[in-house]
Amino acid sequence: MSFPDITPDLKAAMPALRGRLLANESLAPLTWFRVGGPAQVLFTPADADDLAYFLKHLPAELPVYVIGVGSNMIVRDGGVPGVVIRLAPRAFGEVKAEGDIITAGTAARDKRVAEVAASADLAGLEFLFGIPGTIGGALRMNAGANGGETKDILVEATAIDRRGETHRLSNADMKFTYRASGTDAALIFTAVRFRGTPSEPAAIRARMAEVQAHRETAQPIREKTGGSTFKNPPGHSAWKLVDAAGCRGLKVGGAQVSEMHCNFLINTGNATADDIETLGETVRERVKASSGIELQWEIKRIGVKAS
C-alpha cells in the first residue's frame, strides 16, 4: 500500500526545514518486530528547533506519531497515514552527568543512560539497563523493570506541542500511573533530567549485572519481539495468566507466544503485523475466558490494517 505523496507541499510550506522528509518510507526496518507498512511521511528532524518549526507549520489535520527504536510497537501492514517522526540519536541522543543529575535526549537508549549514570557513581537508574527502548518511550509509558520505574527518577522533561511551543514538565506534571503518563498525547518529548543517588560503584555494577542476567535467562532477547506485550493487571502477572490459559507457544501464522516468557510475542521469521496483533487478541480472549481478567495491551499499535 502507498499513500498520496504530500512531501512536496510540506517542503514548499516549510522553506527553512533542515530535517529529512521521506514519502512512503517502510517502517518495518525501524521496528523490533520487523513488520508493518510504510509511513505516508517519515520526518527526521535536525534538532529540537527544527522539530518545533516543523510542528508549527504542519497542517493541523495531519495525525502525528513518534517512534524511537520501535521496541514496543506494532506498525500495522497497511502503513501509517499522516506523519511519523523519528528522533535520531545524532540529534537527540546525548547523555551527560553533572553532579547527581543525568541529562539525556529522548532518542538515547535506556541502557546507555544507565551506563552513564553508573560511570558517574549514581544509583537508581540501574533498572533502565534492562529496558530495550529509548528515553522518550520510557517517559510516555512510565517504563519500568526490576523494581524501578521512570517516575522514581524523573526531575523534569522537555516537550514540544503541535503548535511548536516548548514546555517543561515536572514529575507531578507527568501524572504518572502504572505503564502510563497522563500528559497530552500530542506532546513530543525531546529531553529529560533524571536524578540519581551517589553510591558505591561496585554495588551499581553488580545490580546492572543482575538486571542483564535476568534478561538473558528469562526473556527472548535474541528474537524479533516487541518486549512485554500486556500490562500486569493489579495483583497478577500477565505471563502467569497467559500460561494458565494454555497460550505458551501458541501460533498464528508466523507469530508465536514465546516459550521462554509468554508475555512476549515473537516473529518467527515470516510474520505479518496482522499475525502478531491477531495472536495478541487471541491470547486476550483466552485469558478472559480462563480467568475473567481482560489483559490490556502494553505494546503500542499504530497505522491501518492492509485492505
Curated annotation (Swiss-Prot):
Its main location: cytoplasm. Its EC number is 1.3.1.98. Residues 34-199 form the FAD-binding PCMH-type domain. GO terms for biological process: cell division; cell wall organization; peptidoglycan biosynthetic process; regulation of cell shape. It is an enzyme of class 1 (oxidoreductase). One of its GO terms (cellular component) is cytosol. It comes from the Bacteria. SUPFAM superfamilies: FAD-binding/transporter-associated domain-like, Uridine diphospho-N-Acetylenolpyruvylglucosamine reductase, MurB, C-terminal domain. This is UDP-N-acetylenolpyruvoylglucosamine reductase.
